[in-house]
């Protein structure tokens, strides 16, 4: 089953982003710090390429900081300004505003030099579903003006919000790519809750999670389930070991349905510890392979 989700409201929101872009000075893109490349919407990136932009690595409290730091450098080397935030706990949010003012300082200075009183900075926030845009906005404004829920598709329309006297923000719904370059992106976005579970092949996603864990966080996997597997073991074998530890057999068979749900839920509730799904060395290997 191919993972794909681009409902009508996302297509409409994409058109509206294009239309409203001329009204804004700067774009904020929220990505999930656990998969900053996979949750970076390259399609929207192309749409907003002529605007100044800040990429916000949100949920920084949930990621493997050492691995995510490599992705921060990756984006900065491409010319982006990157800011870490933990919106849920209100950490580093004001730095985003400070960076926006820095990015637009020359434009504001030119207006002042001409005797023009600078208006409030107009910004737009974009991102795939469930990366924490609404929480980010509510914490920044210090009141609940955007709907929040730990599931995709909660914000369905655009709205202008006043963050403070210096900056206004156009909130937009979560928008996915019309199609994924590869299914690994879809699986990672499924794991962070950007795609609805009821349209996702959770068995494939859970096996993919095992694949990532056994190569990058094997100790976390073994410690959580009190198992002793290696990165050479088959993913289905590892799932059997987890099922054996956590669930009784049903009619002689392992309870795979419960095990699949357990694995995904344990990731989403940080039972494996601090995890970054996007592995920077994988990107380097792919680039080297493409060059050859």
PLM feature spans:
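Glycine-rich phosphate-binding P-loop
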Residues: 122-142, 146, 172
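Alpha-helical scaffold segments in soluble metabolic enzymes
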Residues: 95, 99, 135, 208, ...
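Residues at the C-termini of beta-strands that transition into short coil/loop
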Residues: 57, 86, 173
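Structural beta-sheet core signal
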Residues: 29, 55-57, 125
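Helix-rich effector regions associated with P-loop NTPase G domains
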Residues: 1-26, 34-42, 47-52, 66, ...
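Short, structured loop/turn "capping" segments at alpha-beta junctions
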Residues: 107-111, 138, 144-150, 216-221
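Canonical P-loop GTPase G-domain recognition
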Residues: 61-126, 145
């Amino acid at each position: 089953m191919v993972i794909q989700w681009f409902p009508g409201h996302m297509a409409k929101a994409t058109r509206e982003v294009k239309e409203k872009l001329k009204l804004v000075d700067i774009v904020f893109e929220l990505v999930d710090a656990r998969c900053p490349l996979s949750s970076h919407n390259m399609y929207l990136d192309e749409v907003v390429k002529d605007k100044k932009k800040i990429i916000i690595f949100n949920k920084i409290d949930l990621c493997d900081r050492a691995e995510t730091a490599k992705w921060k450098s990756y984006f900065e080397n491409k010319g982006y300004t990157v800011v870490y935030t933990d919106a849920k706990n209100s950490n580093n949010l004001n730095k985003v505003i400070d960076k926006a003012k820095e990015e637009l300082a020359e434009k504001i200075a030119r207006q002042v030099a001409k005797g023009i009183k600078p208006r409030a900075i107009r910004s737009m926030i974009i991102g795939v579903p469930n990366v924490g845009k609404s929480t980010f906005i509510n914490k920044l404004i210090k009141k609940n003006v955007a709907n929040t829920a730990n599931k995709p598709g909660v914000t369905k329309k655009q709205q202008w919000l006043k963050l403070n006297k210096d900056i206004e923000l156009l909130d937009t719904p979560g928008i996915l790519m019309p199609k994924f370059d590869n299914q690994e992106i879809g699986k990672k976005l499924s794991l962070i809750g950007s795609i609805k579970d009821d349209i996702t092949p959770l068995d494939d996603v859970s096996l993919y999670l095992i694949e990532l864990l056994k190569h990058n966080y094997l100790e976390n996997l073994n410690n959580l389930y009190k198992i002793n597997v290696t990165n050479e073991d088959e993913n289905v074998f590892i799932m059997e070991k987890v099922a054996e530890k956590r669930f009784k057999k049903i009619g002689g068979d392992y309870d795979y349905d419960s095990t699949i749900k357990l694995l995904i839920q344990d990731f989403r509730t940080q039972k494996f510890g601090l995890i970054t799904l996007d592995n920077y060395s994988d990107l380097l290997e792919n680039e080297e392979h493409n060059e050859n």
